[in-house]
Amino acid sequence: MNELRRRWQVMSQRERLMALACGGLVVLCLLYYLIWAPWQESVRQWQMTVERERQTVRWMQQQPPRFRRRKVRGGRXPVAISANGIGAQSAVRYGITVLRMQPQESQVSVTLARSDFNNLLHWLAELEQKNGVITQGIDVTAVPNSPGIVEVTRLSLERVL
């Protein structure tokens, strides 16, 4: 420490001023790179996260009501589904064979034969849009070595007015 003090005293006024300026610059750089820049980066990341979450909320609000949790009020209550309600005729149009239908309270449990996955999705969409029948649950298994063909072992449907 004495060596530093001796060197400081040997320096001219101009050299001392330059050393102080350089020291101040080093301190400012350290503050910027060790504190300010990481803090700004974390703020930017949080802002991006908040914006992504806002976009997700907007997307969820724009989705059709079938993706929202149903509320049983205001005349929108589950009703028993008849065989016609499931749209057996529309199933045939889409090449879907209904093997078994079993009523369960306000739902109907349906077992289907192997069918084309895209046709199944179109059929379920038509049931919802035209008949007010929503899918409560579905178990789908891909058929090995048959691209696009699935086996539906359980399909629970419910009609909502």
UniProtKB/Swiss-Prot annotation:
GO terms for cellular component: plasma membrane; type II protein secretion system complex. One of its GO terms (biological process) is protein secretion by the type II secretion system. It is found in: Cell inner membrane. Residues 38-161 are periplasmic. It comes from the Bacteria. Residues 1-16 are cytoplasmic. Gene3D superfamilies: General secretion pathway protein M, EpsM. The chain crosses the membrane at residues 17-37. InterPro entries: T2SS_GspM, T2SS_M_periplasmic_sf. Keywords: Cell inner membrane, Cell membrane, Membrane, Protein transport, Transmembrane, Transmembrane helix, Transport. It is a single-pass membrane protein. Belongs to the GSP M family. Type II secretion system is composed of four main components: the outer membrane complex, the inner membrane complex, the cytoplasmic secretion ATPase and the periplasm-spanning pseudopilus. Forms homodimers. Interacts with OutL/GspL. Interacts with OutE/GspE and OutF/GspF. Inner membrane component of the type II secretion system required for the energy-dependent secretion of extracellular factors such as proteases and toxins from the periplasm. Plays a role in the complex assembly and recruits OutL resulting in a stable complex in the inner membrane. Provides thus a link between the energy-providing OutE protein in the cytoplasm and the rest of the T2SS machinery. This is Type II secretion system protein M. The lineage of its organism: Bacteria, Pseudomonadati, Pseudomonadota, Gammaproteobacteria, Enterobacterales. The gene is outM.
